[in-house]
UniProtKB/Swiss-Prot annotation:
This is UPF0260 protein Sfri_1740. Pfam families: CxxCxxCC (PF03692). Belongs to the UPF0260 family. It comes from the Bacteria.
Length: 148
């Protein structure tokens, strides 16, 4: 069984491999979001980055994603506090605020199937952003409703 490094290792001390393994691969960070100009309220949409594979919830061009999507955000220990748009289910966010990993997390289950089965991921729930005319028509609540 894998050592539960996330319990004993501070985020800023993790190796790049440990840091990357924290990502559950849910795909929610790849959803387009809208921030209301007047209220600063955050809204998730089901319009996903055109590089997201809707079946695997992975980026089709992950190693080179910034070439294709320059505005893609790299989540790091240095910027995690600023990324308030990450969903509460995100392992990076959870660990940053002192919570543990949820029971469905791939580091605890050994695969992504429990996450998909629990409805945590975006699997089968997104549309390609290139096919969307108005993001406002794509606002959804489910990315925020599935926290353990």
């Amino acid at each position: 069984m894998m050592t539960q490094f996330w319990i004993t290792t501070p985020l800023e001390k993790m190796t790049p491999e440990q840091w990357e393994s924290l990502c559950d691969g849910c795909g929610k960070c790849c959803l387009n979001k809208i921030i209301d100009d007047e209220t600063d309220e955050l809204y998730y949409t089901n319009a996903a980055c055109h590089l997201l594979d809707n079946d695997t919830c992975g980026c089709r061009r992950y190693p080179n994603r910034f070439t294709y999507v320059p505005e893609c955000t790299s989540i790091t220990p240095e910027n995690i506090a600023e990324l308030t748009w990450l969903p509460d289910s995100c392992a990076y966010r959870r660990l940053h605020v002192g919570k543990g990993l949820p029971s469905w997390h791939p580091l605890l289950t050994g695969n992504k199937e429990a996450m998909h089965a629990a409805g945590i991921s975006v699997q089968g729930k997104t549309v390609n952003e290139m096919k969307v005319k108005y993001l406002e028509d794509c606002i959804v609540l489910w990315p925020m409703l599935d926290v353990e």
